[in-house]
Amino acid sequence: NEQSGISQTVIVGPWGAQVT
């Protein structure tokens, strides 16, 4: 998602969730 010029990618996998 792009908010205020900041791009965030939420990755959900078997290890859990992380935001990059």
Curated annotation (Swiss-Prot):
One of its GO terms (molecular function) is carbohydrate binding. The keyword Transport does not apply. Keywords: IgA-binding protein, Lectin. Disulfide bonds: none annotated. Belongs to the jacalin lectin family. D-galactose-specific lectin, binds the T-antigen structure Gal-beta1,3-GalNAc (Thomsen-Friedenreich-antigen-specific lectin). Potent and selective stimulant of distinct T- and B-cell functions. Shows a unique ability to specifically recognize IgA-1 from human serum. Tetramer of four alpha chains associated with two or four beta chains. This is Agglutinin beta-4 chain.
